[in-house]
């Protein structure tokens, strides 16, 4: 009599599983390649009726069950399973390189270890009869997954044979209800005895005590069958038969193959010959899943063509950033970076480069503000514009730059606002309501963003955003260019609790806090745009200075965001950051106040500057005056050249200095005192 043949189990990993695997590898496992448990479900076979060419002509077609691995494979608590599905646990091994995945010895070790664990479980009351192994290599850049499933099955010797044919089961619905009430999707096979309506069930480990030996009760096994073939049960029965024979001495039994609908069958099985009395040898195990071509080889799942291109781009952008956390900076908070809303005042050379680098860091919300249009000289220096943007008078810079950002990466929320920024020393009409609306719009923009970049091409245009940024406690990063020099700095946040923690004895900047762009000035900002020659009106700089300054400006912001004190982070130098024992540091290193670069000398200096209590941009005099009088204060600043100096007391300070100088005019600095 021919040995009983079994239908191999088929794997069915879903796209949701591969997405969950990619996220788990990228965000949690990283370089950890130790194996881990996952859950799946075994779905039984079923038979369906399909219509042929004639209406009255139908065919009964069998559909095999499978092992379905879904998106919840890594979750401890699984969702609701289909009515006749069974939950099983397996082992997942994600290799870090394709070479490791191709190593056959590594896969053999994993398979043998799983077989050993299964055999050890036979000595417990919870034998593991349906383990599975999944080895894979995930190419997360291309969304290609190389994988191979194994369903270890122990080879019974002697083999099992059928005593007759497989027959339909009359009491199948009673058996199905019994399985659901007793085992609740947790077992693939169980023992059965009695007749309807007095059926009873027990786990396989109770085989020695469940049946009455005096009555010669036949052992009956019910198992969830994944095979739709009439005379070949599913792969999972192999381990059940081996376990009952090896651990409980069963040589004959009745098996009920539980399938969907009315297609379940039953048959009597027995060993083809008496078991050997020779010392037991380790059983042989088989079970690697074959490729659809019939070969014993891995499979490949390529999800790239299936994914939405926009979502694909978003995941690809995040991939490089998340890889930083694998080995280099595990403490990097990428969510804080991506959630930061950035306002870029100026969409010229600096604005274009800053926007691109912010996108590289994963920033998703960028608003650009500019009032000018694209000119023919812009595209070669401003990478978001092309020649076509210059035609017919030129497109507005801010909306055009925002559109180009979305073309580069559709996942970015980029907005462009055409807005002129009122400036000190640039008079306005007393009835000019448009300026007041511009101020209100600018203040609303500053208020609704987390970080503000000052990237304009004049000194006085930075004044109003400086005041607004200080008022609303925003991170303000300023970048300014010379011919072969640049300044990148962050504005201080005032004398808050965080700002007062700046070290003074160890080389810090004292307790006044960090200064702003105007804290070193002893005169108010005024009109610097009028009465200029052509070389003064155009931005004349070495072309490489702007991208260097833009990169430093963005990196300074990111370092501030990663610091525990955020906008209140103290000014640090590389030497003090390395020797500091404080835990309140940025994982990206020291967070300086100012960076002053000189291309002529190839030098970048770290500078610290205290807040000036009479500063025209961030002092309490200015903030209180704006808080009290609002736009009326601003109108006087725009129209009256010396008004800011009066508000802050700089004029009085200047007069006092003049008196001191006048009082020193009669002194003879060259004479020496007599002893």
UniProtKB/Swiss-Prot annotation:
Transmembrane feature ranges: none
Region Disordered: start-end pairs: 268-293
Entry's Gene Ontology cellular component terms: cytoplasm; cytosol; extrinsic component of phagophore assembly site membrane; phagophore assembly site
Any one biological process term the GO annotation gives: protein transport
Main localization of the protein described in the UniProt heading: cytoplasm
Top-rank taxon, per record: Eukaryota
Single annotated GO MF: Atg12 activating enzyme activity
Subunit composition and interactions: Homodimer.
Function text: E1-like activating enzyme involved in the 2 ubiquitin-like systems required for cytoplasm to vacuole transport (Cvt) and autophagy. Activates ATG12 for its conjugation with ATG5 and ATG8 for its conjugation with phosphatidylethanolamine. Both systems are needed for the ATG8 association to Cvt vesicles and autophagosomes membranes. Autophagy is essential for maintenance of amino acid levels and protein synthesis under nitrogen starvation.
Identification of the protein by name: Ubiquitin-like modifier-activating enzyme ATG7
Organism: Cryptococcus neoformans var. neoformans serotype D (strain JEC21 / ATCC MYA-565) (Filobasidiella neoformans)
